[in-house]
């Protein structure tokens, strides 16, 4: 459900649910199709406006008033990008909240690494969202209360919460990947997590 919270959207008078991802993550939509199940096609399109004009993305959209109604009951909003709120209290059992957060991370976060100019390996992960969403993540992961959020640009309602990964805070990724299975996680980010885990172990 976290992935839908991040990359999904409600259309057509709350009857249709759509999910759009970068073309490189099309396999994740194929997994979603298998779980629903959904027999329609995954569309491939090109961005025509904004700062990624020409880049390709994949999308599925289908009519499911029941699913949309259930998601809205849990707190998903239409036109949510700038006003996204956490799920309604109690709508996600405590033992599944880390799966929800991982879905958000798969949709709107990143896990990556690079070698800096001094030849040192640097790894980081970050969560992206409204202040309400980041506070929800902080409350449930229970990371440091003084962790700072960075506004993406002036007057933007979306903020970034970034961690430079180390042996002492690898538990953050361990937590969100706990009990995850291949059919529900984004392969590309999971592989990055394994690389970081191997490096620090």
Please place each PLM-identified region on the residue numbering.
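Internal intein/HINT superfamily modules and their associated LAGLIDADG
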Residues: 1-201
């Amino acid at each position: 459900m976290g992935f839908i919270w991040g990359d999904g959207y409600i259309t057509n008078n709350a009857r249709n649910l759509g999910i759009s991802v970068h073309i490189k993550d099309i396999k994740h939509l194929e997994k979603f199709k298998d779980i629903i199940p959904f027999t329609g096609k995954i569309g491939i399109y090109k961005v025509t406006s904004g700062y990624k004009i020409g880049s390709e993305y994949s999308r599925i959209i289908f009519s499911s008033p029941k699913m949309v109604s259930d998601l809205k009951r849990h707190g998903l909003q239409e036109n949510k990008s700038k006003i996204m709120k956490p799920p309604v209290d109690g709508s996600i059992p405590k033992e599944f909240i880390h799966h929800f957060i991982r879905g958000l991370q798969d949709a709107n976060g990143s896990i990556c690494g690079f070698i800096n100019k001094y030849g040192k390996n640097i790894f980081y992960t970050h969560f992206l969202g409204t202040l309400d969403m980041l506070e929800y993540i902080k409350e449930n992961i229970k990371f440091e209360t003084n962790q700072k959020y960075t506004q993406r640009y002036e007057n933007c309602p979306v903020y970034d919460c970034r961690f430079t990964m180390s042996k002492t805070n690898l538990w953050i990724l361990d937590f969100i990947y706990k009990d995850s299975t291949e059919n529900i996680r984004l392969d590309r980010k999971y592989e990055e997590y394994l690389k970081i885990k191997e490096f620090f172990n």
